């Protein structure tokens, strides 16, 4: 029996077991560049920017006549997931750190592709009532996970390259973040799972950086967006940060009489990235 390849397209990344082969310690810039290039070559290969017929696997190049059979070609990773949103931001940062434009070129090429095909998948969805779930995540986001990380990365490259045709995608994402995401009474981003009015530390990164980056995109409202980003950060930190540990709890339930502190490493990583943003 053929062994199933486990990847982000068929298994949630947070359920995968690590298989570290590298060693920890001081690294030279040359070693870092070598590792970054190794990872970059892999993710570039595993994230094709093509539309295919899901029944035949054949590439579709004329988007104007495609129907519900159309989907993004499946690689190991999804082009519009929150995991890939933070990967896009990492690649932008890699260009800034190394001067190697290939990393940002990758981000721009994937965003140009998504901007080109999104209207056609939207047409299919409106006509047929269904389309590729990976595009529905872009067209009709239902959670910060669907919108925030990719939106923040899009803004970062859009403010540097005005020719990048992602305004419609950015505005659709941000409309959800600003106007449709569930919030506590004081405006803090929240969820209704696993309990009513629950804060997830993850949502610091899934929401706040996009708001902060919008201050660069819409300079007329710069101060409003910066104030909102700071307000969100402080309201999360007030409930989630544990001073004696120097860490954040992963969850906070408004109706709870006590607030246990489970400090998940991955979620604390989201909080630290948010602080950097």
Question: Where do the PLM segments sit?
Answer:
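Residue-level preference for long, well-ordered alpha-helices that form the structural scaffold
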Residues: 28, 32, 83, 103, ...
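Carbohydrate-binding/catalytic loop surfaces
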Residues: 56-76, 125-157, 187-203, 245-267
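Extracytoplasmic/secreted proteins, especially bacterial periplasmic and envelope-associated proteins
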Residues: 34-38, 86, 102, 106-109, ...
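Alpha-solenoid helical repeat scaffolds
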Residues: 97, 117, 160, 217-220
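Well-ordered alpha-helical segments within folded domains of soluble proteins
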Residues: 9-20, 79-96, 133-158, 199-216, ...
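Mid-sequence acidic-hydrophobic segments that form the walls
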Residues: 157-160, 173-184, 213-217, 236-239
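Low-complexity, Ser/Thr/Pro/Gly-enriched N-terminal "stalk/linker" regions
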Residues: 2-129, 164-180, 184-185
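Extended ligand-binding clefts on enzyme/binding-domain cores
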Residues: 198-277
